[in-house]
Amino acid sequence: MRKYFTLKTIAGIAIFTALAAILYCVPGFQFSLGFTPEFLKLHFDEIPVLISSFAYGPVVGVIVLLLKSLIKLPMDMGNFGIGVLADLFYGVFLVVPASIIYKRIHTFKGALIGITVGFLSNVIISSIVGLYTIFPLYEIVYGDYVWQQFWWLDHSITSLYSFKISYEFLLPFNLIRASIVCAVTLLTYKPLKNLINRDYN
């Protein structure tokens, strides 16, 4: 454990956590899409998290994910931390598969395969869990407000449990979000190759 968490690794955790926290917490780095409710915002804090998991391994990736979530949590208490919990859960399904595969296949091809698997698991899980777990939690807090935001965009939606919410809103939103995160990570792979290919075993 002492060998794994060297000063260089700890410094890397601090740097990537700071970058992820800035992207996650500063409103200027969050964007709304015209075809989704205002509360669904794009944020790209998973980019430094994913890069950290490639550079130092899956464990460090999860640590960075947890730390940036803890930093955000006090700002999300108005939602009882539901949004942070959801982002943490979704992030695990992106970062862990991608970094485990990359650790086994330590090449650009491995990074591509890992990111593809992480992308698919993240999009599928976030779309399903969002509809059947996260949104019902929001409904407990806000009542009908959540599904009414979708109703304003599509009057055929009469319930938060409408499957149409998933394929008309959640799936496209998650596809766009995960595509940007994965594409930027792959584009930065080569410039950061020396960092990513360090021996973290």
Where are these regions (language model features)?
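Loop-helix junctions at membrane interfaces
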Residues: 1-201
